[in-house]
């Protein structure tokens, strides 16, 4: 097929119309989702993606970067296929953008065998399911909404309730404990958080730039000439970013770019070797939001609450690719921003149906000073089942939920009549529920710089033992404050004894 060259006919914000002259049977128009390249006057290449065919010889495209400086009549070159992402050992420890270019200032990436970002989900006969729990070391999650290996997990919450901190703690705990590989897609979030995440990962050794670079970083420098590329390939994570300042085309596609990298690692295992990949997305709502912006720019009629009419289709197409096959598993953790704390908004509501476990963060719990601010009654998990987690774990989890639910029902009576009007049995329920509620908190390693308290990871046996002791009344004599921001029940008992001694003085 002969190469055809188009020309820009119209630019409206991030939407670029491209006109192809003399298009006949031999010279085909670029297909939907094909990438086209525009050479800017400064020599840099702008990638645009075909979204619509309008008229006979014109395609409407959405830009993956700023369209500043484009003019009508500039030449546009089809690439002959969709946007692709580089693959292999070379991308370990690297930062990439939506089109797979490195954005960390280091050497450029080789495109040999690159994967297209628009791929079909695996065939039905290739899928597998694993009924195995992925323990995180976070008490409230492991006890009440355990995560499934190879499952999809959603962290729901409004603005500023701790979704990103929880995702960073999960990366810290799981990536260190589970020696597999992680992929992080930053979708429409703050650039500062991406910068913090990179520094945090270099410090913790999840990304390895080498000792010489680490020493220069600790002195306040950022000298990329000191990066050891042999060490870099031992890194356990790749980062793909399309942040808040990017145009909507980039934010809508960067989740697919990150997913493509995760799929490439899942499928790269040798025969008989299973790869377990962790895929973090922060934030899946921004993917929907960017899709809504693109939809409006392309002139589609909006649907409920102003979202795109194709919301469920776009979400389904992406979520169906996040799955486990015979070659390996992808366990995904997705932060979901909840606009105005309304879980019935179409964006979070559409995401719900794809998930195996949901962790709901609640502003009312942050107001009590309990972190992570997980709502234990609103959060759910498909695998909280005695056949999977064991009878003892299941029984303790159900008892915790029952006592918290009963406490919630009694709050109305307390607010009107006061604690004195409760029966002795109900007073006991409220006192134990308040201890349980506080024991669901714990200090995080990633928040240590703010709190000054070292983070802890708590094993599932210690978690079950601690909650069982509270429910059985073995620690009723300790003050409530002893259970706040501690790891194991032993720490709570020690803290409680100190508080009692101080009270006597």
From Swiss-Prot:
UniProt GO molecular function: ATP binding; ATP hydrolysis activity; proton-transporting ATP synthase activity, rotational mechanism
- The protein's superkingdom reads Bacteria
Show the Pfam families listed in the entry: ATP-synt_ab (PF00006), ATP-synt_ab_N (PF02874), ATP-synt_VA_C (PF22919)
Catalytic EC class: translocase
Q: Where in the cell is it found?
A: Cell inner membrane
Name the CDD domains for this protein: ATP-synt_F1_beta_C (cd18110), ATP-synt_F1_beta_N (cd18115), F1-ATPase_beta_CD (cd01133)
Signal sequence range: none
Q: What's its membrane topology?
A: Peripheral membrane protein
Query: What does the entry list as the binding residues for ATP?
Result: 157-164
EC annotation from Swiss-Prot or TrEMBL: 7.1.2.2
Catalytic activities: ATP + H2O + 4 H(+)(in) = ADP + phosphate + 5 H(+)(out)
Q: Which UniProt keywords apply?
A: ATP synthesis, ATP-binding, Cell inner membrane, Cell membrane, CF(1), Hydrogen ion transport, Ion transport, Membrane, Nucleotide-binding, Translocase, Transport
Quote a single Gene Ontology cellular component term.
plasma membrane
HAMAP family in the record: ATP_synth_beta_bact
Q: How does it assemble?
A: F-type ATPases have 2 components, CF(1) - the catalytic core - and CF(0) - the membrane proton channel. CF(1) has five subunits: alpha(3), beta(3), gamma(1), delta(1), epsilon(1). CF(0) has three main subunits: a(1), b(2) and c(9-12). The alpha and beta chains form an alternating ring which encloses part of the gamma chain. CF(1) is attached to CF(0) by a central stalk formed by the gamma and epsilon chains, while a peripheral stalk is formed by the delta and b chains.
Q: Which NCBIfam families match?
A: atpD
Query: What family does this chain come from, according to its entry?
Result: Belongs to the ATPase alpha/beta chains family.
Q: Give the protein's function.
A: Produces ATP from ADP in the presence of a proton gradient across the membrane. The catalytic sites are hosted primarily by the beta subunits.
Give the protein name, as stated in the record: ATP synthase subunit beta
Source organism of the structure = Bacteroides thetaiotaomicron (strain ATCC 29148 / DSM 2079 / JCM 5827 / CCUG 10774 / NCTC 10582 / VPI-5482 / E50)
